[in-house]
């Protein structure tokens, strides 16, 4: 936004000036190449994935695409800052190239780095990298699944309509967990009366007891 004040003199010899009311004229925002103003990693106004996708669909050029241009100036990028939760566990690999980086590297090795946030020590931080090890130990300690015996004629699974198929029919799976009846060349398979019941219990109160209903 810009404010324009028009100064109009009363006459040529008079020193009094007349100020007209301020007029606000919206100025068009100027886009700048991102490579010309950004010289650090942090971006204070990072565009969203939706915004980048919209510019890609519109076919914007590089000077209009939000991925390669920005409304921020070089001063905005230089003054932008952020704070970390604490001191990182591992130092950056690029600290040995500059003199400041070498000093920080020596402080890291000597343990003289002070936490950015007071009261947060390195020993108090939760370690999220042990999740995979904890999960593997949990899985190894848990019980193994017992596979069904192939020699038995009928396998009993409580709560599901399970049927036994001969190997010459399917050539692959012997046990089918289809809960709904299927129609094929062998005819319709028998369906238990409580298959569609949500609780899948024999004689449940939420399903009609069909075996007690007379058929005549």
UniProtKB/Swiss-Prot annotation:
Q: What is its main location?
A: cytoplasm
Where is the protein localized?
A: Cytoplasm, Cytoskeleton, Flagellum axoneme
What's the superkingdom here? Eukaryota
Q: Which GO terms describe its cellular component?
A: axonemal A tubule inner sheath; sperm flagellum
Database matches in InterPro entries = SPMIP8
The UniProt keywords, alphabetically, are:
Cell projection, Cilium, Cytoplasm, Cytoskeleton, Flagellum
An annotated GO BP: flagellated sperm motility
Q: Which Pfam families match?
A: SPMIP8 (PF22574)
| Subunit and interaction comment | Microtubule inner protein component of sperm flagellar doublet microtubules.
Q: What does this protein do?
A: Microtubule inner protein (MIP) part of the dynein-decorated doublet microtubules (DMTs) in flagellum axoneme. May serve to reinforce and thus stabilize the microtubule structure in the sperm flagella.
PANTHER family, A to Z: TESTIS, PROSTATE AND PLACENTA-EXPRESSED PROTEIN
Q: What is this protein called?
A: Sperm microtubule inner protein 8
Source organism (scientific name): Rattus norvegicus
**Corresponding gene?**
Spmip8
